[in-house]
Structures are given as structure tokens and as C-alpha cells.
Amino acid sequence: MKKLLAVFCAGAFVSTSVFAAIPPGNDVTTKPDLYYLKNSQAIDSLALLPPPPEVGSILFLNDQAMYEKGRLLRNTERGEQAAKDADLAAGGVANAFSEAFGYPITEKDAPEIHKLLTNMIEDAGDLATRSAKEKYMRIRPFAFYGVATCNTKDQDKLSKNGSYPSGHTAIGWASALVLSEINPENQDKILKRGYELGQSRVICGYHWQSDVDAARIVASGAVATLHSNPEFQKQLQKAKDEFAKLKK
């Protein structure tokens, strides 16, 4: 009996720590056009991820090396792409994936697929990253070095937002996973594009490499959670049906 009680208590402790409450903020109850999930349904990035690398650690040295590597690419074609990738607003996510997907993902050409991507954007970019971002409030590379990003549009706003994990990367990777499910024939191109969106954050100086790596983990968790949501399931099926018609 004592052993059973000990196991139960241990399990209760794990459950509490893994499914800790997400800090208050927007969710499907306040912005249903950008979320499918409630705060209580989202994964807890603070419980899932290790702390970000400390300044002076081996892992932080890698972050610094990747920052310098990315900075050298800013005046190249890849750097130009990174600057474009910084803007995911106003259909930016859908536009970013259209070429890799093989079809234009617009409200006109593929409204159901476009709606799916738009509606899940903050489940990945906000809910899945919120608790770790708010806890650690990690300084971003551009603020750490005092060097402007490759696209300064959101620089002032994001200087007050934690760097770890990367919200943009989470959006990009989650979108890539879902689009790969809709169009598996193009999965390699789609996933590569999703990976590139994350690396663009390093090149631009908005994020450290470890921010990006961590974001891909929470994005995968967010997509798994979304698959248990009835409204997401319905819209995903509509997107798949729409794609089947596009292929004909």
C-alpha cells in the first residue's frame, strides 16, 4: 500500500510539472481566428525545455559562432531571403510555403489550406512558447551585440520579448509539418522550407541557434496537440479535400 501511494504521489508530481499552467494571455477564447487551443490545452515549454545556454558556456559559444556565421550571409541571396522571412504577417506564412508546397496558398486559390495555416499560427508561435519566453526573458542577439537585424520592422517590439524559444521558428516548423501531411509528395521541399525559416532568424540576428532548435521541439508538440482538437481536425480534413481537388 505504501509503495502504491508513493508511485501515485510521484505520478501526480510529474503530471503537475509537465502540464503546469500556461501564463495568461490570448487563446481560442479571445482570438479564435488565430488559435485552436485554450491555454489549458497547450504544451508547457517551460516544463518541456531545458533552460537556455548560459553566457560563457560551451553551448553559448556555439550560439555566438552561429550568429557570426549568419551575419556573414546577410549581404548574400540567402540573407535577402532571411529578411523576407522575418515578416510572417498578412499571409506571410502561406506565401513562404507556396513554392515548396507546389501550389499558391492564398485565400483565393486555396482558402481552406490558407485558413488552416492562419488559424493555427499562434498555437505554435505564442501558446507553445509563452511560458519559457516569459520565464527566461532571454536577451536577443541584436540586443546583446547592439547590432541591428537584417529586417528592423519588428526590432523594437521584439526587444521586449524573450528570445527563447523562437516563436517565428515554431510557426514555420509547425506549418511545415501540417503542410507535409496534406501534400506528402512534396514533404522534403516543405520541411526544408520550414527548416530555413528557423535558420533565417539566426541569420537576421533575431534569435540564437539554441532558440531555434528549441522552437522546433515545441512546435512538434503543438502539432501533436492540435491533432486532438476537433476544430483543427475538421479544418485539416477540409484542407486535404481541397488539395485533392487542386491536384486533379
From Swiss-Prot:
Gene3D superfamilies, per database record: Phosphatidic acid phosphatase type 2/haloperoxidase (1.20.144.10)
Keyword terms, alphabetized: Hydrolase, Periplasm, Signal
Signal peptide region: 1-20
Disulphide bond pairs: none
A Pfam family assignment: PAP2
Top-level taxonomic group: Bacteria
Catalysis: reaction(s): a phosphate monoester + H2O = an alcohol + phosphate
GO terms of molecular function: acid phosphatase activity
Location within or outside the cell: Periplasm
SUPFAM superfamilies for the chain: Acid phosphatase/Vanadium-dependent haloperoxidase (SSF48317)
SMART domains in the record: acidPPc (SM00014)
InterPro entries registered for this protein in UniProt: Acid_Pase_classA_bac, Acid_Pase_classA_bac_CS, Acid_Phosphatase_PhoC, P_Acid_Pase_2/haloperoxi_sf, P_Acid_Pase_2/haloperoxidase
Main subcellular localisation: periplasm
One cellular component term from this protein's GO annotations in UniProt: outer membrane-bounded periplasmic space
Catalytic EC class: hydrolase
EC number: 3.1.3.2
Family: Belongs to the class A bacterial acid phosphatase family.
Protein's recorded name: Non-specific acid phosphatase
Name of the coding gene: phoN
